[in-house]
Curated annotation (Swiss-Prot):
InterPro entries named in the record: Antimicrobial_frog_2, Frog_antimicrobial_propeptide
Sequence similarity: Belongs to the frog skin active peptide (FSAP) family. Ranatuerin subfamily.
Propeptide residues per the UniProt entry: 21-44
Domain of life (superkingdom): Eukaryota
Tissue expression profile of the protein: Expressed by the skin glands.
Function: Antibacterial activity against Gram-positive bacterium S.aureus and Gram-negative bacterium E.coli. Has activity against C.albicans.
S-S pairs: 66-71
Keywords of this entry: Amphibian defense peptide, Antibiotic, Antimicrobial, Disulfide bond, Fungicide, Secreted, Signal
Signal sequence interval, chain numbering: 1-20
Organism: Lithobates pipiens (Northern leopard frog)
A cellular component term, taken from the record's GO annotations: extracellular region
Name assigned to this protein: Ranatuerin-2P
């Protein structure tokens, strides 16, 4: 029973250390988040283009509706 407790304690201790190291590594990766990736730039550009096209289409439909109804 005592050896089982020792092995469980050792297992818990080693697991805690490895978890701590993983969290430190993840924290280091998050600190490097200042750099903007090419994918983020593309995503931002596509969102902008999509919003402009959406607004332009809405404006054109409003003009067309106004011409049809005579407002």
């Amino acid at each position: 029973m005592f050896t089982m407790k020792k092995s469980l304690l050792l297992f818990f201790f080693l697991g805690t250390i490895s978890l701590s190291l993983c969290e430190q590594e993840r924290g280091a990766d998050e600190d490097d988040g200042v750099e903007i990736t090419e994918e983020e730039v593309k995503r931002g550009l596509m969102d902008t283009v999509k919003n402009v096209a959406k607004n332009l289409a809405g404006h054109m439909l409003d003009k067309l509706k106004c011409k049809i109804t005579g407002c």
